Curated annotation (Swiss-Prot):
Subunit structure: Homohexamer. Organized in a ring with a central cavity.
Disulfide bonds: none
Lon N-terminal domain location: 14-209
Protein name, entry field: Lon protease 2
Cited function: ATP-dependent serine protease that mediates the selective degradation of mutant and abnormal proteins as well as certain short-lived regulatory proteins. Required for cellular homeostasis and for survival from DNA damage and developmental changes induced by stress. Degrades polypeptides processively to yield small peptide fragments that are 5 to 10 amino acids long. Binds to DNA in a double-stranded, site-specific manner.
SMART domains registered for this protein in UniProt: AAA (SM00382), LON (SM00464)
Keyword terms, alphabetized: ATP-binding, Cytoplasm, Hydrolase, Nucleotide-binding, Protease, Serine protease, Stress response
Taxon lineage: Bacteria, Pseudomonadati, Bdellovibrionota, Bdellovibrionia, Bdellovibrionales
Catalytic activity entry: Hydrolysis of proteins in presence of ATP
Gene coding for it: lon2
């Protein structure tokens, strides 16, 4: 059914039906579903009158109850051809567009819309027939190409277009069938000039055609990729079949695929992944039984297992870190403060290239365990590399793959086992690195420990760069002097001092006893350590700066008690000064007692060893002779030179010191240091040797309650020495509370715990005159002569700290 808009009379007012997501054109036949109450009322009103209704599109399709402002004013007058009510309450109508119309005003808005409508007349065609024909042909070509590209349009539209010659009708027909946007369709509907309307439709068709051509290219490319993938798949399947015929089977192919997947997913840098895949290609072409195939396979396994991009996240909590350090280590405040500073900076700036810390100190003081505590405080993986006895550079940098049994170096091995690229690696005993004809491993360590270079560390085995800049390296050493200067320059040295007897007592009570009781299967109900027993154990059975031997002795006591408990000899043992010898036998070390009274030529000096401080008694004896000096006690060259310097000082100051004029013509001098089996060396016995010689030559006794340390010059000046803390604590353990030290060592007193410093009278000396003024016992009987002292002892320099 069709209507000619020239003979159909359109009333002045019509019910209006707002439609969503569609624009209805004249001559367009389309079914509509009506569900809103107001819209159903409009349909019913139209059916009750002349079946004509005005259709206008909503501007906002989401609006359920549109206002007049939300409805386009230009629409289409349509005839309701058929109506059917549905079971869900909606109405289905079939309408045909009759003519364009414009809303003059709304005569009713409730309960349904009613509008006054004026018909929009078609503007006469202004263009020539040729121009219009060109526009029509262009539109038809666009439609044909759009259909060819797969747009779901009815092919009959081309037949309909062939029967229509009016540009306006063609534009409306295309716009109503193309399914364009509502805004574009409304613009076409509102254009009254037929030629301009067709031009607008052609522009829309051109844009749509361009989009569809792009989609077609994308689909074609995707199909090509799929075809290529399918082709590769079929070729691989054929290759498998051929290999099966050759007896190689599927196992190798599956193994290669699995290895390829591991390499691709390992997170390698681009250039490293390219090298790995290149080696994988070589491996695929090799026969499985070839010797080189095993080498390449091992290499690829290493490449796949390394943590190229895997990192553990830092969890730095300074309060918790402090608790961990205090829990794991007693004292060591300087080292702990530096570690806390490092952690604080790392928390503020996570990407900072931090320093390489080196803990230096005697064995057993906790250097290695400090590294483990740092890893625990940061939440990182921990790994220890023992460098003691390493003499081959390849141990650090790896062997080249040309060698049989080649492997990466210790650094790469550590990273593989840690499974992260940012672990804490402790380089233990870095001072024990050696060198021989195979190279110098300390030179290879230069690159590892340099933050500016280790981002491109190249292991000889891998032959590709590996980034070590995220690794936190911590080194430990016993003797810092054994570390090459260039390597030492790359590290920040933190000296870890030995423990005092009081430290050992507290650590034993807090840690060692509990650990050994648990390790040996007994309980606290079976054993009790008294303070006197622990002190006796420390003094008589250990002589070290650390704690290893002490823990062994505590463990030995616990094992003895465990044996007694199992054999039902007793259920409880109190470990005191009496029971320790019964359990462990006689003491292994006898501590020298301090000198009981003042003697001529006998002086108490102070020495430092790796086991801590020692009180060293120096004895001088004269005998008939010609002024010769004999030295015994296994002295080193430096100590011998100190003795000769002391002898020269005595000769040069013979008169003012009160030495008899004929002493050097009548007597030889013999200086001996007891414990002759132990080598001794160093300059710190200088003032002790000089005091002993002058005491012997003048017959003046030396105070028995005083000890001293310091280097001496020929001019009589007292120079600074090291190990002040350990030396002073050793003297205090023997009950010596008066100690002469060089004035320049006053700064070292800060390292002595206050509880010990308060018990010691420190006498600071700048020259030998000040030493003699304090050291010689002027009240001792039998004193024949007194050395002439130019100056009184400087009371202002004597610190009762």
């Amino acid at each position: 059914m069709s209507f000619d808009d020239k003979v159909l009379e359109i009333p002045q007012t019509l019910p209006m039906l707002p439609v969503r997501d569609i624009v209805v054109f004249p001559y367009m036949i389309i079914p509509l579903f009506v569900g809103r109450d107001a819209s159903i009322r409009s349909v019913e009103e139209a059916l009750a009158k002349n079946r004509l209704i005005f259709l206008a599109s909503q501007k906002d399709i989401t609006e359920e109850n549109p206002s007049p402002d939300n409805i386009y004013t230009v629409g289409t007058v349509a005839m309701i051809m058929r109506m059917r009510k549905l079971s869900d309450g909606r109405v289905k109508i079939l309408i045909q567009g009759v003519a364009k119309g414009r809303v003059k005003n709304f005569t009713k808005t409730s309960p349904s819309f009613e509008v006054a409508v004026e018909k929009i007349e078609e503007t006469p065609v202004q263009k020539t027939v040729v121009e219009n024909e060109a526009l029509i042909r262009t539109a038809k070509e666009h439609i044909e190409r759009i259909i060819a590209l797969g747009r779901p349009l009815s092919p009959d539209i081309l037949l309909v277009l062939d029967d229509v010659s009016d540009p306006g009708r063609i534009a409306d027909l295309i716009a109503s069938n193309l399914g364009i946007k509502v805004q574009d369709a409304q613009k076409v509907l509102e254009t009254s000039d037929a030629t301009e309307r067709l031009k607008l439709v052609n522009e829309i068709l051109a844009a749509e055609l361009e989009v569809m051509q792009t989609q077609s290219k994308n689909r074609t490319g995707a199909k090509d990729d799929m075809s290529k993938s399918q082709r590769e798949y079929f070729l691989r399947e054929q290759m498998k079949a051929i290999k099966n015929e050759l007896g190689e089977g599927d196992s190798k192919s599956e193994e290669m695929d699995e290895l390829r997947e591991k390499l691709v997913n390992a997170g390698m840098p681009t250039h490293v992944e390219a090298e790995a895949l290149k080696q994988l290609g070589r491996l695929e072409r090799m026969h499985p039984d070839a010797s080189e195939a095993t080498m390449v396979r091992t290499y690829l396994d290493w490449m796949a297992d390394l943590p190229w991009s895997k990192k553990s996240e830092d969890h730095i909590d300074l309060k918790r870190s402090k608790e961990i350090l205090d829990e794991d280590h007693y004292e060591l405040e300087k080292a702990k403060d530096r570690i806390m500073e490092f952690l604080a900076v790392r928390k503020l700036k996570p990407n900072l290239k931090g320093p390489i810390l080196c803990f230096g100190g005697p064995p057993g003081v906790g250097k290695t365990s400090l590294g483990k505590s740092i890893a625990r405080a940061m939440g990182r993986e921990y790994f220890r590399i023992a460098l003691g006895g390493v003499k081959d550079e390849a141990e650090i940098r790896g062997h080249r793959r040309t060698y049989v049994g080649a492997m990466p170096g210790k650094i790469i091995q550590a990273l593989r086992q840690a499974k992260t690229s940012n672990p804490v690696i402790v380089l233990d005993e870095i001072d024990k690195l050696g060198s021989d004809f195979r190279g110098d491993p300390s030179a290879a360590m230069l690159e590892v420990l340099d933050p500016e270079q280790n981002a491109t560390f190249r292991d000889n085995y891998l032959n590709v760069d590996f980034d070590l800049s995220n690794v936190l390296f911590i080194a430990t050493a016993n003797v810092l002097e054994n570390i090459p200067p260039a390597l030492r320059d790359r590290m920040e040295i933190l000296n870890i001092p030995g423990y005092t007897e009081n430290d050992k007592l507290l650590i034993t009570k807090k840690h060692l006893i509990k650990r050994q009781i648990e390790a040996n299967g007994i309980t606290e109900e079976n054993i009790k350590f008294t303070d006197e027993g622990i002190k006796y154990l420390i003094a008589g059975y250990t002589r070290e700066a650390g704690l290893r031997n002490l823990e062994r002795e505590v463990g030995s006591v616990c094992r003895k008690v465990a044996k007694m408990v199992v054999m039902e000899e007793t259920n409880f043992v109190e470990v005191n000064a009496t029971t320790v010898p019964e359990l462990l036998g006689p003491p292994r070390f006898q501590r020298d007692d301090k000198i009981a009274d003042s003697q001529v030529g006998v002086v108490q000096g102070l020495a430092w060893t790796q086991a801590g401080g020692e009180v060293l008694t120096i004895e001088a004896l004269k005998m008939k002779g010609k002024g010769h000096l004999a030295l015994t006690g296994q002295l080193g060259d430096v100590m011998k030179e100190s003795a000769h310097a002391a002898m020269s000082y005595a000769r040069a100051h013979q008169e003012e010191l009160g030495i008899p004029e004929d002493f050097f013509e009548k007597y030889d001098v013999h200086v001996h240091l007891p414990a002759g089996a132990i080598p001794k060396d160093g300059p710190s016995a200088g003032i002790t040797l000089t005091t002993a010689l002058v005491s012997l030559m003048t017959g003046t006794p030396v105070r028995h309650d005083i000890a001293m340390t310091g280097e001496v010059t020929l001019q009589g000046r007292v120079l600074p020495v090291g190990g002040i803390r350990e030396k002073c604590l050793a003297a205090l353990n023997l009950g010596i509370t008066n100690i002469i030290i060089p004035m320049a060592c006053q700064k070292d007193l800060a390292d002595i715990p206050k509880v010990f410093k308060d018990k010691i009278n420190f006498i600071l000396a700048e020259n030998l005159d000040e030493v003699f003024a304090v050291a010689f016992d002027k009240s001792a009987k039998g004193q024949e002569k007194k050395p002439a002292a130019k100056k009184d002892p400087k009371k202002t320099k004597s610190l009762a700290a």
